[in-house]
A protein has these predicted regions:
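Flexible loop and strand-edge segments within Gram-negative outer membrane beta-barrel domains
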Residues: 2-13, 27-106
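Gram-negative outer-membrane beta-barrel transporters
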Residues: 173, 177-178, 269-271, 293-382, ...
């Protein structure tokens, strides 16, 4: 709740989805369309000067996909369109003129192909993607503003960019050895530069029937979001001259895979360039804004390990304990925040994370899921003008469900121990909360 006692983490949502398909002798076609509405109190997530923020989002999405059924050659085209409408209220219900309205449209075309020969599998294709935004706050001034439906306000800012990419990949599969190598060439109208190339290699070797080792090297690019480029309001100051993030990722690991036990251990090293972040200098006072910046270089080393026990494989489908899994992850970055500098993303991360989960069959279709999580986050947050370090915390969740063929009834409780903790920024996370519901699957 906010300081006035009103709700500031409430939410209401509705969704609708349709999917159809056609199966022919030469081609299969799938299509879908959906809509979702969500209204939610966003607490102090976007800024600390208001604890009564609110957001309304509406999303439309549709796509058509096809695949030919040739013996050696397959063609997989798809076309999609997504629209998102957003109204953000920094001060909930204080008037339309203070709100931030935005509408994004993403239109894309994928042309994927692959050919299978005695030399392996060769995949190639292209993607064309256009994304645009019109807004009251984000983007460059528009020559022709667009009316916002339902209110006497115009979208008077916007930005549009198109991405083109072409990819080529070849995979060789031998009895115990697999090698895949490829490259992506990409060009975006936003940065005005030519095509850039991003290679990748994946290799694996079967040591024994149940043991496999693997290694990979991949490169990637991420463009700054519209928010990172233009969000300048309520304690935030964006930089529209941000550069795109670039990443080189190395990973190696070993897997043990059987029907009853699955275990994996991996080590990775990421070399990041121009990593995008929001930072704030607390030494300059509470009015100092968050600023979007590029970190010139940021290297990350990590370890992940997990094991899953499927007890149904050993004692049958009616086992009381159906399965149990536990995982651990560790991350270390070679750049730390400077004194009084608070980071939202790049320099704020989970140093340690432990997750344990089990699924129990209580009776017939009555099941219980229990989940335990322990996290230790690196970074700082500000509260009441003070800089605080994150503290480790433990969470326990449970979900009880009756799982029938066409319907499901459930009740779940999160943060059963009612822990007080901060997981991002200076926003206190909810204590214990319970919800119940039902789902039903219609067959047409």
């Amino acid at each position: 709740r906010n300081k006035a006692g009103g709700l500031n983490a409430d939410f209401k949502q509705s969704k609708g989805f349709y999917q159809g398909n056609y199966r022919g002798d030469q081609v299969d076609v799938k299509w879908y369309a959906g809509i979702s509405n969500k209204d939610f109190g966003s607490n102090t997530f976007y800024g600390v000067s208001s604890d009564d923020q609110f957001e309304h989002t509406r999303k439309f999405y549709t796509a058509v996909q096809a695949e030919t059924k040739g013996q050696n050659y397959h063609f997989k085209p798809s076309v999609y369109w997504n629209r998102g409408e957003d109204r953000f209220e920094y001060f909930r219900g204080k008037g339309e003129n203070t709100y931030n309205y935005g509408r994004t449209d993403v239109l894309g075309l994928n042309l994927n192909n692959y050919v299978e020969t005695v030399l392996g599998k060769t995949a190639f294709g292209a993607e064309f993607r256009n994304e645009g935004i019109i807004s009251t706050k984000l983007g460059e001034p528009l020559d022709n503003p667009t009316k916002i439906h339902g209110v006497d306000i115009d979208y008077d800012k916007g930005l549009n960019r198109t991405n083109m990419s072409f990819h080529l990949e070849h995979t060789v599969i031998l009895p115990r050895f697999t090698l895949s190598a490829g490259v992506i060439a990409t060009k975006n109208t936003w940065d005005g530069e030519g095509f850039k190339f991003y290679p990748g290699v994946d290799v694996s070797y079967q040591l024994a029937r149940d043991w496999k080792i693997y290694a990979s090297y991949n490169t990637s690019l991420r463009l700054p979001s519209f928010t990172e480029l233009y969000y300048t309001m309520q304690g935030y100051k964006a930089d529209k001259h941000l550069k795109a993030e670039k990443m080189q990722a190395f990973e190696g690991g070993i897997k043990y895979l059987t029907p009853g036990v699955k275990a994996t251990v991996s080590v990775y090293r990421n070399h990041g360039t121009n990593m995008i972040d929001w930072i704030r200098d607390t030494s300059k006072g509470e009015d100092e804004p968050w600023q979007s910046v590029n970190h010139t270089k940021l290297n990350t080393t990590g370890v992940e390990a997990s094991v899953l026990f499927n007890f149904r494989h050993f004692v049958g489908q009616n086992a009381f304990v159906k399965d149990f899994n536990v995982s651990y992850s560790y991350i270390d970055k070679d750049k730390e925040s400077e004194p009084n500098i608070v980071s939202q993303y790049a320099l704020e991360y989970l140093k340690h994370k432990v997750v344990a989960q089990t699924n129990l069959r209580l009776y017939s279709k009555l099941n219980l899921n229990i989940s335990y999580r322990w996290q230790d986050r690196i970074g700082n947050y500000t509260t009441d003008g003070k800089t605080m370090s994150y503290k480790p915390y433990t969470l326990l969740d449970a979900r009880l469900s009756w799982d029938a063929k066409q319907y499901r009834l459930f009740a779940e409780a999160n943060n059963i121990l009612n822990k007080t903790y901060y997981d991002h920024g200076n926003v206190p996370q909810p204590g214990i909360w319970v919800r119940a519901g039902a789902t039903y699957r219609f067959n047409f």
